[in-house]
Amino acid sequence: LHTAYRRQRQMCIRDRHPTGYADSPYQSPSAFAGNPLLIDLWELVELGLLAPDDIKGREYGEDPSTVDYEKVIAQKKELLRKAFFSFKEDVSYLAFIQEQSWWLEDYALFMAIKQHNELRSWMTWDKELRFRKPEVLAAFKEEHIEDIKFHRFVQYMFFTQWNKLKAYANKNGISIIGDIPIYAAMDSADVWVNPKLFTIDISLRPTLVAGVPPDYFSPTGQLWGNPLYDWDAMERDGYNWWLSRIDHAMKLYDMVRIDHFRAFDTYYAIPADATTA
């Protein structure tokens, strides 16, 4: 970390969640998972899960000044799959999936179903999957267990590397400031699993979505489209989802920034069928 040699004592890291719509980590499929794109493939070589030739010569786009996310995601996914096939479960891995099962199992299942449905939003899935019918989910798990295990493996690798990074930063006197986006994405495991905590009706459609009033960015305001929280439902649940989210973030960062202030200071509750804020 070169920041250590410039006497910098804090490093602010933008949202580290998986990217979703428009390659944005602020429309993430999970409020808890880590972004597979941040996994260092060379560390997988050191673990014997990949060979150097697997990585060398890869083409990630023609313009080095921009990121071709489509190519990067495709290449990374292919290499992570290859590493997964070489991976042998060990004590550390089993401890991780047990400790993180409270969010990891839902996320891995969500991503496996999403993959099976050509990455379409969960709102377009078959009714039994949308409404999480236990017998249908159990059958899917049995049939697609390897896909579910793959997503567990990816998260294990992300968090293993992240923890090493944080330990190294802290050892060098650098604290990490990390983001928590104020809203969850509609197309996320969080909303799919916990629709009653959001402004979602009985047909699993959003009723009110997030945005802000007109400002110098837009004369019609900003319409973000994230479902709002049902704070009454959150209160009845003891704010468990939010407390778990903050507790999880505090294990990854030294300080947490909720992004951003305007989103909960002057937010709008916008009808879901509106075209502007």
What feature does the model see in each segment?
Residues 10, 173-177, 255-257:
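Structural preference for beta-strand elements that scaffold enzyme active sites
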Residues 2-9:
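Single conserved hydrophobic/aromatic residue that forms the stacking wall/gate
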Residues 22-159, 184-277:
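Alpha-amylase-like alpha-glycosidases and glucanotransferases acting on alpha-linked glucans and related
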Residues 151, 155-184:
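Conserved, well-ordered alpha-helix/loop/beta-strand core segments that scaffold catalytic motifs
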Residues 13, 110, 169, 179, ...:
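Conserved, mostly hydrophobic/aromatic
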